[in-house]
Amino acid sequence: ISDDIQSIIQGIF
């Protein structure tokens, strides 16, 4: 789950 959050953040940036 933690990786999913970071993946979304990187996708935005």
UniProtKB/Swiss-Prot annotation:
It is found in: Secreted. This is Venom peptide 8. Expressed by the venom gland. Disulfide bonds: none annotated. Its main location: secreted. It comes from the Eukaryota. One of its GO terms (cellular component) is extracellular region. The keyword Nucleus does not apply. Keywords: Secreted. It comes from Brotheas amazonicus (Scorpion).
